[in-house]
Amino acid sequence: MPWDSQDTRRRLLEAAIMEFSAYGIAGARVDRIASAAKANKQAIYAYFGSKDALFAAAFEDRIRDFHASVLFDEYDLAEYGGRMFDKFEDAPETLRLVLWYQVERADGPPLEVILDSNEDKVRRIKAAQREGKVTRTYPAVALLGLARSTAMVWHTQIPELASRFPTDRRDRRDTVVRAIRQILDP
C-alpha cells in the first residue's frame, strides 16, 4: 500500500484530539499520539512543528467542526444552546479540548477562527436586538456567553453534583433550552 501523507496527518490529528482531550497540553505525550496514529513520532514534528502547534491544529479542527455542525440562529438562541448541548453529548472530546484550552491557553494569543466566529455571532445578535426579535435586557455578548455556558452546564460540574443530575438526555437538553428561553424572555 502506498504511503499517504494526508492520511498520516489526519491520523495524527485524530490521535492528538483524543490525547489532548484526555490529558491536556501539559499531560499529553507525543509518543502516545504517534503510537495511536500508527505513525513515527518524527512525523508529528514534520507535519506540525511542535507539540504546541499540534494542539493548536487539533483544537482548531474541533472548533471548525463545531462551527460547521452546530447551526447558529440569532433568533432562537435557546435551540442553538440545545444544539451545542447535543454536540457536547455526541463529541465530548470537543468540550474537553475547550476546557483544556481555557485552563492552559488563557493567556495565549487568540485564535482567529474563534475571534471571527464570535464577532459574527455578536453582530447577528445585535441586529436581532435592533429588530426587536431578541431581548435587550442583556448585551449581545452576554447573551452569547449565557447560551454557551447554559449548554455546558451538565458537562462542567463537579462529580458530586453531576451524580444527582437527570440521566435522560432529553430531560437535560430540555432543561438547557428552557433555561435559555427564560433568560431571553424574563
Segments predicted by a language model, with ranges:
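Amphipathic alpha-helical interaction segments
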Residues: 11, 53, 79, 83, ...
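Short coil/turn segments at alpha/beta junctions that flank glycine-rich nucleotide-binding fingerprints
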Residues: 22-26, 91, 131
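Amphipathic alpha-helical packing segments from all-alpha helical-bundle domains
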Residues: 67, 71, 106-131, 141-145, ...
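C-terminal peripheral helix-coil segments that are non-catalytic and often amphipathic
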Residues: 86-90, 119-131, 150-186
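Amphipathic alpha-helical linker/stalk segments
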Residues: 22, 56-83, 118-121, 126
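N-terminal intrinsically disordered/low-complexity leader segments
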Residues: 1-7
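Helix-turn-helix
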Residues: 11, 15-53, 57
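Helical hydrophobic small-molecule/effector-binding pocket
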Residues: 78-112, 151-159
